[in-house]
Every structure is written in C-alpha cells, then in structure tokens.
Amino acid sequence: MRIGYTGWTWISNERDNWNPINERHKENFEQFLKEVSDLGYETVENFNWIADYYSDDIEGFKNVVQKYNLKFENLYFYFSDNPDKDYEEAKKYLEFMKSVDAHYMNMQGVMWTDTPYQRPTNKEQILSYARLSDKIGRLCKEYGVKACMHPHANTAVFTKEQIDLYMENTNPEYVFLCIDTAHTTLAGIDAPELVREYGKRIGYMHLKDIDPDETLNTEWPMKRFRPLGCGCVNFKGVVNELRNAGYDDILCVELDYQPVCNYRSAQISREYIHNVLGL
C-alpha cells in the first residue's frame, strides 16, 4: 500500500469558509508538496480546482510534483445540482488527469451547511447520484481511472443505509467506494466492518481519526476530526480488513481542521502509520 496526503488545506482557509488563503495558489501547493515529501508520503491528491489553477501549465504541474518525488493520483470531484453539467465537468477533469497520469477520481454529493445535519434518506437523490456515477464511472474506465464515491457528512450518501442503497444501484465495473474512516465513524458505522463488507469494491481510502466525545463541536461535528492515533478509529482493524480483501492501493491521509498546523498534523499521522501500523 502507498501512503498519501491531500493538499487542499494548504490552499483553503478553514477559518474563512474554505476560501483561498491568498492568490498564491501555486506557491501554496508547492509548500504542501515540500512538506509531505519531507515527511515520507508517497502520493498526493487535491480537489478538482487544482486542475483549474494549472489548466494552462500542465508541464509546470508535473514538474513541481516530480521535484518532490511524489505521485499525483487523485482528483476530488464534487457533484452539483446539475447532473448534465457534472458529466461535462468530469470530462474536462479527466483530460487533466490523463495529462498528469492520475488514476483515481473521488466523487461526493452536494453538501449542506444548515441544520439538521443528519437527514432522512433521500432515495430519489441517491438514485440520481447512482445514475450519474455510473455514467462518470464508465467514462473514467475509458481513461484508466477508478471513480470512487466518498460518503460524507451532510450529504445524501453518508449513513450505512444510504451507502448500501447507493452501492446496490451502481455498476461494480464502473463505480468503487472511497471509505473515509472519520466520516464513517461519525455516521455510527464501524470502519473495519464496512471495509469487510465492501472490500472488493473499495478503490481508495481516506484515513483520519475522530474524537469520540459527541458533546464537542455540536455546532459542526466535523471539527472533531483528528490526526491518526488521536481519536477512536480502529486503524489496525481497517488495515487488516483491507489486507484480507486484497486491497493494495492508496491510503490517503486527510484532515480538515488542524490542532496546530498542516505540517504537524501530517507528521503525527505519518509517525502513527509507521510506528503503529508498520507502513
């Protein structure tokens, strides 16, 4: 398994509704690469807007990633309320991915920010996402890319019931699952058990921890996310189940909110992966 890190938190401001920290996007992206390379990470990913920042400088993108001996592998793609637009956007981003030799596209449903955060299952919305995912997944396969749905808090695909409905209605030839260990736990799902159930359909993994204290950050529960080893996720169980399923792809670490700074979070997680998980 290769160990990766996601870089959007070096570019987006967690204290300003995730707007860009400044206009020096490429400098911030390079700082991310420099730091995670220093810590021994092997692969990187980013949200799809990184492709827009480098749309006129593909060679510059490839060169800066190679400069730090990293491999860019995943572009994170958000659905909107317009499936036709999403499909056309996916085409555009797949061209970028082809040009930089990336092999995974995470997909996520539209996220709401108003309460209630957890809502009843919206079968119609999930089936709509499933149809769109099959279309994008079929296209991804033509590009040599795995399309992976990322269940996420405050979206229509989050709970076990919602994940099951989505997976039952997508083609396993075209659509895979990206399990995020913290979002899974936040949804009340045991992460190793979910890996065991969907092992053969897992195409990508997001690793982050979560504080089990549900009284914390009730105004925005995702602020309970933590570096690896600082919460309650059973990562040994997750890795064991991945091995049992024959998974040998990427384990990508991510953390939305930093206890100190991005570098320190990435360092804590990398040390945990090495010292505790033996990877």
Residue ranges of each PLM-predicted region?
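Residues at the N-termini of beta-strands
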Residues: 43, 104, 204, 249-250
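Acidic/histidine-rich catalytic cores of soluble enzymes
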Residues: 43-44, 73, 134-232
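Gly/Pro-rich active-site loop or hairpin
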Residues: 14-26, 117-120, 185-248, 257-260, ...
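Conserved radical SAM core fold
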Residues: 10-13, 79-82, 111-116, 211-214
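N-terminal pre-domain/capping segments
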Residues: 1-104, 123, 141, 172, ...
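Acidic-and-aromatic substrate-binding clefts and catalytic sites of carbohydrate-active enzymes
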Residues: 46-58, 78-88, 113-117, 153-159, ...
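Non-cysteine beta-strand/loop elements that form the S-adenosyl-L-methionine
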Residues: 4-8, 102-109, 201-212
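Active-site acidic/histidine proton-transfer and metal-coordination neighborhood
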Residues: 67-71, 82-177, 236, 263
